[in-house]
């Protein structure tokens, strides 16, 4: 992932502390069923003997894995991540499963840039993620960007505005019941649901069942009203969109959002088509706040 001119952002420090009200690491491991009281005594003794952190002592004794310690540290610092093998989300959510990877560090840099721009223009808190063609990575970027915003402590909403080929309900392992389609068709008020038990600050409004009239539904005033309500309730709202070459859906969504982030894939996205998309968005009054070039 190549993101230009995005300032750096440091990840959560990997250390242990009982200061500032953080919970005890041993208590977290006990509550997770990884240690019992006797094991804690053994770890504490090894910790004092070797002068090493509690987690390192527990791993050294073979009582827990490094992954167990990492998960406990994440809970200790209120930094939600998922353990490998968690069936509640798709592994493509690298921001949840691989928070220390280079790709996720790049996502944090992008998040920092968006936060800075929002500070200058507070209205830019509802952003459509758009692109020219299918397979460029819009859904992946929208989902993982939503995760890193929630990890920052922001109340985050991810809306699947791709009513033709919705992916968010698959990435977050949700059923198709309810969702945006049902709300736009005024058939149900069931909508936003928590993305995962570990991500209390992230809600997802999945698309729902694929309708025969996606563009007409998105053009209804109800959609703009849904986004207006989200602006009041959430710190950041990200909206996934269909590919622009399928129809006018993406531009309708972006116009309702007011801001758009344009996604391209290296060696696949044609520069001319990208320029045409950006120009058409600006003509529709959409603020193009940046571009992301994915290279994986």
Residue ranges and their predicted role:
Residues 85-112, 119-120, 130-134, 154, ...:
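P-loop/Walker-type NTP enzyme "switch/lid" segment
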């Amino acid at each position: 992932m190549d993101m230009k001119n995005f300032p750096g952002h440091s990840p959560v420090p990997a250390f242990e502390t009982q200061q500032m009200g953080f919970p005890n690491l041993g208590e977290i491991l006990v509550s997770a069923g990884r240690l019992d009281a006797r094991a804690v005594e053994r770890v504490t003794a090894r910790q004092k003997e070797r002068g090493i952190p509690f987690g390192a002592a527990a791993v050294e004794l073979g009582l827990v894995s490094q992954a167990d310690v990492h998960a406990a540290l994440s809970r200790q610092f209120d930094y939600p991540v998922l353990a490998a093998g968690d069936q509640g989300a798709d592994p493509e959510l690298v921001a949840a499963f691989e928070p220390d990877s280079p790709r996720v560090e790049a996502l944090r840099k992008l998040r920092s840039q968006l936060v800075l721009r929002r500070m200058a223009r507070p209205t830019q808190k509802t952003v459509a993620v758009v692109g020219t063609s299918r397979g460029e990575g819009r859904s992946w970027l929208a989902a993982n960007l939503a995760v890193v915003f929630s990890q920052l402590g922001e109340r985050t909403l991810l809306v699947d505005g791709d009513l033709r080929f919705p992916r968010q309900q698959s990435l977050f392992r949700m059923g198709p019941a309810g969702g945006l389609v049902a709300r736009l068709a005024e058939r149900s008020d069931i909508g936003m649901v928590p993305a995962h038990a570990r991500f209390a600050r992230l809600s997802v409004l999945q698309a729902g069942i694929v309708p025969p009239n996606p563009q007409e539904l998105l053009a209804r005033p109800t959609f703009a009203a849904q986004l207006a309500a989200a602006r009041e309730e959430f710190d950041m709202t990200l909206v996934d969109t269909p590919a622009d070459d399928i129809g006018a859906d993406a531009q309708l969504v972006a116009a309702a959002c007011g801001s758009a982030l344009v996604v391209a894939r290296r060696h696949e996205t044609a520069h001319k088509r990208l320029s045409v998309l950006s120009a058409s968005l600006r003509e529709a009054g959409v603020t193009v706040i940046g571009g992301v070039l994915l290279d994986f």
